[in-house]
């Protein structure tokens, strides 16, 4: 009798061990199935955190504004400004006439229509017009393929860029890698930041950001003339970035 009881105890113990092993194995299987989801969620959270920090850093870039930019633009609110390489043109009749721009009512986006050319090369082309006297053309800013921003003309003066809107707009020329006219990611990001800061500075909304096409019907900037949805997304990105700059500035003041 005692042997039978002992046998039953051993059998019960084996069954309990098997059940525990079975539960452990099932739990491991569940965890293995969930692992990709957990990794994906962690990656998403990391990306969101990185994007938030990146937006905050962009909004705080004004701390590094150099003395040349200060001299070119004067005593203004630099908070949220991107890094700007100031290389002002010589005052001349063909690219920097030195005529006052009394009130900025809009931002005009252009493309260079010269694939692979650099911001520096386009700036130098404007500068050399004083000697070649080929035509009258220029821009306040030129953004390069790596996102570098070169300022050619103070925003207090007109540029020869946007025809009958020269007298009340700031112009931004953008370099591009190919004939499609689509900007690189770095060019795009700098364009959004610069435009958002200018909109904040001059109290403009996204509707005040226009294409050269909207002034003259010219195929400029080509990619945004041919892709209306991409243009509207760009203006939405500008509006969002402008709000980020304002929020960061208010947070800093509080």
Predicted regions and their residues:
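Basic/polar, cationic surfaces and motifs that engage anionic cell-wall
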Residues: 24, 28, 33-40, 48-82, ...
């Amino acid at each position: 009798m005692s042997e039978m009881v002992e046998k039953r105890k051993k059998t019960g113990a084996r069954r309990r061990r098997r059940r525990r092993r079975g539960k452990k194995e099932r739990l491991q299987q569940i965890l293995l199935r969930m692992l990709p989801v957990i990794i994906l969620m962690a990656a998403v959270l990391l990306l969101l955190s990185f994007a938030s920090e990146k937006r905050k850093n962009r909004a705080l870039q004004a701390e590094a504004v150099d003395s040349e930019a200060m001299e070119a633009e004067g005593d203004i609110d630099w908070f949220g400004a991107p890094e700007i390489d100031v290389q002002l043109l010589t005052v001349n009749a063909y690219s920097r006439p030195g005529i006052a721009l009394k009130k900025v009512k809009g931002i005009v986006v252009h493309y260079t229509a010269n694939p692979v050319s650099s911001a520096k090369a386009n700036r130098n082309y404007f500068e050399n017009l004083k000697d070649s006297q080929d035509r009258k053309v220029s821009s306040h800013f030129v953004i390069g393929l790596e996102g570098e921003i070169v300022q050619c003309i103070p925003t207090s003066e007109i540029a020869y860029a946007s025809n009958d809107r020269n007298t009340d707009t700031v112009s931004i020329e953008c370099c591009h890698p190919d004939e499609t006219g689509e900007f690189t990611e770095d060019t795009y990001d700098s364009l959004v930041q610069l435009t958002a800061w200018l909109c904040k500075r001059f109290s403009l909304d996204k509707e005040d950001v226009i294409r050269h096409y909207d002034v003259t019907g010219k195929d400029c900037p080509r990619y945004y003339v041919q892709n209306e949805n991409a243009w509207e997304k760009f203006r939405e990105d500008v509006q969002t970035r402008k709000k980020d700059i304002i929020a960061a500035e208010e947070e800093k003041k509080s």
